[in-house]
């Protein structure tokens, strides 16, 4: 995925929804929900989307969201309301219409 949004791709419905909750949204400019285009000409893994999010939407410290090529411990990831552990984690192949939810379970005190 690159950082350009192709109007043809969006009009064809080849997008996913990415949502941040539990404080994770503060790392993305306070925006809770983003519609992200998919490249319909190739298979896109969740791992690739994580890098795209880091490189294109992340406004906070990358270390608070990612650790190496995955999300850091303390961030729950749900794919269409199912724990990503059951879906293959970073090897999950994104599908048009997917809803990916990141929930931070780490709170300062």
Swiss-Prot record:
A GO CC term assigned to this protein in UniProt: cytosol
Record flagged with keyword Cell inner membrane: no
Matches recorded under CDD domains: Ubl_Urm1
One Pfam family this sequence matches: Urm1
Subcellular locations according to the entry: Cytoplasm
UniProt xrefs under Gene3D superfamilies: 3.10.20.30
Role summary: Acts as a sulfur carrier required for 2-thiolation of mcm(5)S(2)U at tRNA wobble positions of cytosolic tRNA(Lys), tRNA(Glu) and tRNA(Gln). Serves as sulfur donor in tRNA 2-thiolation reaction by being thiocarboxylated (-COSH) at its C-terminus by MOCS3. The sulfur is then transferred to tRNA to form 2-thiolation of mcm(5)S(2)U. Also acts as a ubiquitin-like protein (UBL) that is covalently conjugated via an isopeptide bond to lysine residues of target proteins.
Protein name: Ubiquitin-related modifier 1 homolog
